[in-house]
Curated annotation (Swiss-Prot):
It is found in: Cytoplasm. This is Phosphate acyltransferase. It comes from Helicobacter pylori (strain P12). It catalyses: a fatty acyl-[ACP] + phosphate = an acyl phosphate + holo-[ACP]. The gene is plsX. GO terms for biological process: fatty acid biosynthetic process; phospholipid biosynthetic process.
Amino acid sequence: MKIVIDLMGADHGVLPIIEGVSRALENKSFSAVLVGDKDKATPFISKELASKVEMIHTQDYIKMEEAATEAIKRKESSIYLGMDILKNGADALISAGHSGATMGLATLRLGRIKGVERPAICTLMPSVGKRPSVLLDAGANTDCKPEYLIDFALMGYEYAKSVLHYDIPKVGLLSNGEEDIKGNMLVKETHKMLKAYDFFYGNVEGSDIFKGVVDVVVCDGFMGNVVLKTTEGVASAIGSIFKDEIKSSFKSKMGALMLKNAFGILKQKTDYAEYGGAPLLGVNKSVIISHGKSNARAIECAIYQAISAVESQVCLRITQAFESLKPSVSVHQSDQQDA
């Protein structure tokens, strides 16, 4: 299995990415292709690691402040070169660089799976249960039609079933209330269409994401990104409050010591690094979009995530789902119109 790793554009430079690749290679068998500035990377690559990876040199990359559309023009940029390697035989790509550039190039260079109108970013959210919830779209599509959300539901269902091994995933539609009549026009129209599918649970509220009420939560990219950023902010704020209170007295420090294991589990469940990255679903190869602030652990987990996606053949599963399941939407709509 060959995995392409974009070294450029992350907030903390190349070091955490190289460390993450090194750790993953200690635990999994795969071929790593590093794309980026060789001069910046070489000081951090040991002789042992150098023997296990292939290095493709380029100094160009799409900066965060640049428009995503720059990517298609910059054929020597790290993400363009990486996407070409993926298109021409590699199995997966991971990038912690410009997410818009990654999404745009993946769509243009790899192509969409037949039947998919818009690819979506799929992210894992912590829940009170033993397994996380899947949220999509987490930011790829700000403005959506109901048909796009149907695509997201199908892709999220297949990802949960194939990659996460959830037996019969339940899919919920994010709304401002669980009643069928709640929601804006987009939610109401999507709800009607999703009723055609056995996996559809119904509307869910924001709090249900973390209760594990459903396995997959579907929404437009604007709402999904707000949910994601709010979750990150709340988790960070709670962590800071805990630290301040623990340091406030000797009694608090002793109590924290007794709860060390519980705090460790809480941190693991709420730490974005443990989830790796966010798969871009709907394109013809596995692409993982990692957080710009990714540390070595996040890159390591993103690689494991990519390996799971490839081994589970999730792109093929989504293709098959669109061939067999999506036509039922048009049938359902026709039935409604006839009625």
